[in-house]
Amino acid sequence: MHGILSIQSHVTYGHAGNSSAIFPMQRMGFEVWPIHTVQFSNHTQYKQGWTGRAFSASDIDELVQGLDNIDALKRCKAILTGYQGSAEQCEAIIRTVEKVKAQNPSSLYICDPVMGAPDKGCIVAPGITEYLVDHLMPMADVIVPNQFELSQFAQMEINTLSDAVEACNIALAKGPKVVLVKHLYCVSDDKFSMLLATPEGCFLAQRPHLTFAQQPVGVGDLISSLFTAGLLKGYSTMRAFQHCHDACYGVLKQTHQLNEWELQTILAQNELVEPSETFPIERLNLNLKTA
């Protein structure tokens, strides 16, 4: 039994972190082995607050060792990481990736480098951004940053599409083979834009921007999980990009139609495997150079 090791946050109610990522990967045909970095009652934007706690780095190490004890790591096809609760957890991620790749060199490491958005109630602990930029992102096969996280990794401001391509160029030169920018907000106000960069080129996808009374949480986690599952199904990088873009829109559209705050992932589950709408992907003519 092959599986995906997903190490990120978890909420009991709603869809964020692992609660947003696990089911889409399962629905696309994969066993998922979740390890939670934090476990909260709900996501942190609720004005009533939340309950729960963060786990320690040793908790991650202990669970990974347990998987190793039953020879599961050699059957791990990918490690997907998202929100980390401490810099020490980032160290545990490094150990985990190294241990998995030692037993299965073909496994992929997909890093969703959550650096926090205080205005959205997402706050990361001190040292996490530095660990992501200096260690986790360079060792990843695939990174799935938003525009801000890409700018931190590339150490440059991103104000235009040309800037974004340059930042992707820098990112690819640092180690990752694929950069998927899950939200590129410098391009258009009335469309939601995503950018894919590989050594073969740069590609832009845009879909209608849906206006919510309260912006759903966990969209980035949904995108990274769909992209991971697509790659593991043997899709080309471009097809995996197309699929995750269109499938995510399908979930968001149903969420919007029902005027819900939490992602309607279960109700929209058919969108995860057969998106009802397909949007064009534009190959950019801007130069993308790799070292």
From Swiss-Prot:
Pfam families: Phos_pyr_kin (PF08543). Pathway: Cofactor metabolism; pyridoxal 5'-phosphate salvage; pyridoxal 5'-phosphate from pyridoxal: step 1/1. ATP binds at residues 112, 144, 149, 182, 207-210. Its cofactor is Mg(2+). It catalyses: pyridoxal + ATP = pyridoxal 5'-phosphate + ADP + H(+). The keyword Acyltransferase does not apply. Keywords: ATP-binding, Kinase, Magnesium, Nucleotide-binding, Transferase. One of its GO terms (cellular component) is cytosol. InterPro entries: PM/HMP-P_kinase-1 (IPR013749), PyrdxlKinase (IPR004625), Pyridoxal_kinase_PdxY (IPR023685), Ribokinase-like (IPR029056). Substrate binds at residues 9, 44-45, 221. GO terms for biological process: pyridoxal 5'-phosphate salvage. GO terms for molecular function: ATP binding; magnesium ion binding; pyridoxal kinase activity. Its EC number is 2.7.1.35. Pyridoxal kinase involved in the salvage pathway of pyridoxal 5'-phosphate (PLP). Catalyzes the phosphorylation of pyridoxal to PLP. Homodimer. Belongs to the pyridoxine kinase family. PdxY subfamily. This is Pyridoxal kinase PdxY. It comes from Photobacterium profundum (strain SS9).
